[in-house]
From Swiss-Prot:
Transmembrane segments: none
Localization (cell): Secreted
Molecular-function GO terms, alphabetical: toxin activity
GO cellular component, one term: extracellular region
PTM characteristics: Contains 6 disulfide bonds.
Expressing tissues: Expressed by the venom gland.
Segments forming domain Agouti: 56-95
Keywords: Disulfide bond, Knottin, Secreted, Signal, Toxin
Name assigned to this protein: U13-lycotoxin-Ls1a
Note on domains (UniProt): The presence of a 'disulfide through disulfide kOR' structurally defines this protein as a knottin.
Disulfide bonds: C56-C70, C63-C76, C69-C87, C78-C85
Keyword Endoplasmic reticulum applies: no
Family recorded in the similarity comment: Belongs to the neurotoxin 05 (agouti) family.
Organism for this UniProt entry: Lycosa singoriensis
């Protein structure tokens, strides 16, 4: 029973690959016409708009300094000094620095971790 199932699976796979090649070769030889979209006029007015540049960069995106990064604790980390800069996670001190120097994307409050506080 297993061998019959394997044999049928192999035959089906060969059939699928051979039929794809027939369609591809027929399309390349212009034997098949490309399908036209009937509703193309309906969507002509809905052309995509140019994406506006964001005021801040998400984690992993390019940045020039800490003020370019969105999150309060995000810092602009650069390789080899000033090359290949991207926003990465910082800490509480990063947030305080950004609060002091940034005019745009200025943090309103800095989150403090509860891990280091002593209880009792």
């Amino acid at each position: 029973m297993k061998t019959l199932f394997v044999l049928i699976s192999i035959l089906y796979a060969v059939y699928c690959f051979s039929s794809e090649e027939d369609v591809d070769s027929a399309y390349l030889a212009n034997e098949l016409e490309p399908v036209e979209d009937i509703n193309s006029e309906q969507y002509a007015a809905l052309e995509p708009k140019e994406e506006q540049e964001r005021s801040c960069a998400d984690m992993g995106q390019d940045c020039k300094d800490d003020c370019d990064c969105c999150l309060n604790i995000a810092t602009c980390n650069c390789w080899f000094g000033r090359y290949f800069c991207s926003c990465t996670f910082g800490d509480y001190q990063t947030c305080l620095r950004k609060k002091g120097k940034c005019k745009r994307n200025r943090p309103q409050s800095c989150p403090r971790s509860n891990l280091n506080r002593k209880k009792g």
